[in-house]
Amino acid sequence: MPSGVFQKRPKAAETISLFCMILIRLSRAADDSHETSTLLATITTITTEIIPMPDSGRSCFGWSSAPEAAGGNCSRSNRNGTLKCYGGMNNLAALNQSGKLSRVQPALEMLLCGWPKDGLNHFRDLQKLPRLRSLTIEYSGFTEFKFDFPEMLELHTINISWTNLSYISSRTFKRVHPLKVLDLRWNQLIQLDGPLLLPRNFEQLYLAGNPWNCTRNFKWLLLQPEKGRLVVDRDELICTDRKYKERQMLMVMHYKLELKRQCQSHEDLRNCTCLMHHILPKTHIPLYTVNCSHLQFHRLPDFLPDNTTTLVINDNMISDINPLRDNPHYRHVVDMQLENNQISNVDNLEDTYWLQNFRLLNLRGNNLRKLHVYALDNALDDNENANLLLLSRNPWHCTCKFGSRMRELLTKYKDIVRDAWNVSCTYRLDDDQLLAKVLTLSRQEMCNLSVEGGTQIHPIDWLNGVLASLIFLILGKLAYDYYYYKYYGRVPWIVMKMP
């Protein structure tokens, strides 16, 4: 073939060379199987996660097409001493009696494919294979191990992958003393009760590819370095729970430990509950919630962990909320739960950064009687983040001026003040027990019956009456002048006397 053909298609030559290299790698022995999967993983890249391609020589891939699968039997490969069982181990005793598993030709490796039961409980059969060094269980439907693994004198590698295994006890592999490598990738494990109890000389644990729930306790990965280092692929563990979906487990655990350290380092927060409720998608910044309810606080905490966005401090004795204005630790706190405290004044928040940027403010069950309605109105009008404001169960007093403005505010922001219909007030100074819902009170009830006016007719109503009378007087005068001019041809004498 002319050389010019290869010169025009250099990419084709590279592709052929790469394909040949893959074939060579696939034909290598078991010691290179890890390199093979690594090579294939670099070629077969998926945007969300990399799924390893199983090695057909050491895997159960396509096991259901094997002749032994119909009867749940095993077959012995004399070439490498591998015992393959498909859907069960029904003929294992027969193989022993036939001498195919004798000391002269012991089974060194075992593949258990397609185990159909929910629980794998035939581990005692493994003791019939005393020279077994490697055990692989794949493509099986069991969800847990009924019993712990028995003592095995030479079993140093266990691979359990592509199964429905969802629970594993920390003691499952404790008695396998020669164990050095344990591969639990690509199962359905959600959590571990704690670090697995493994032999002293254990070397490598693989856990990637499982749907881990990072709301559970995996802090031991960082708190117990000698245990955490055994998890070779710890950087690849991904959370799948709703709260931390697609986040790295190590990152989530690091943030949890840092939050715990900050909360325990400050005296105000030692009895509080500190939680991480979210991690921002792009920046991976953690957002924290601090709950100090029912702890007899007389003031807001002086310190909050970095990135705290929610403070729940209900059912305490707090009366001063000035830290929302002055304390820089509260700058990023957008949700404040202050229900059932002793707050009587919120006017200090007027024109503050916090009031113009808050998202949730719960002031139910406090001692509020009045507030600057215009300041709150301006803040809610400018605040695009405001989502919830709760004001009910306060001893509001509706004077004529405040009550009217409060009613307008509740009507205007009913989508934000969601308990607006439950906001009640007293509207008579001589009867503090007479409560009415602000949205149902008329202006006449708030003004005419108020002791503030001293009479049943408010001065504003008197002024309105006078102005109305003057208007009617002017209109009457114009009508008289028009009539007089029409019938007498001249304006009234009083107009003639005017300069």
UniProtKB/Swiss-Prot annotation:
Annotated signal peptide: 1-29
Ranges annotated as spanning the membrane: none
One Gene Ontology term, aspect cellular component: plasma membrane
Keyword Cell membrane: no
Extent of the LRR repeats: 154-175, 178-199, 307-328, 332-353, 357-378
Keyword annotations of the record: Leucine-rich repeat, Repeat, Signal
A Gene Ontology BP annotation from the UniProt entry: intracellular signal transduction
Keyword set includes Nucleus: no
Domain LRRCT: 210-265, 394-449
InterPro entries assigned to the protein according to its UniProt record, in alphabetical order: LRR_dom_sf (IPR032675), LRR_TM_domain-containing (IPR050541)
PANTHER family the UniProt entry points to: ANTIGEN BSP, PUTATIVE-RELATED, CHAOPTIN-RELATED
Described function: Has a role in the ecdysone induced cascade; probably indirect control of 'late' ecdysone genes.
Protein name (Swiss-Prot/TrEMBL): Protein singed wings 2
Annotated source species: Drosophila melanogaster (Fruit fly)
Gene: swi2
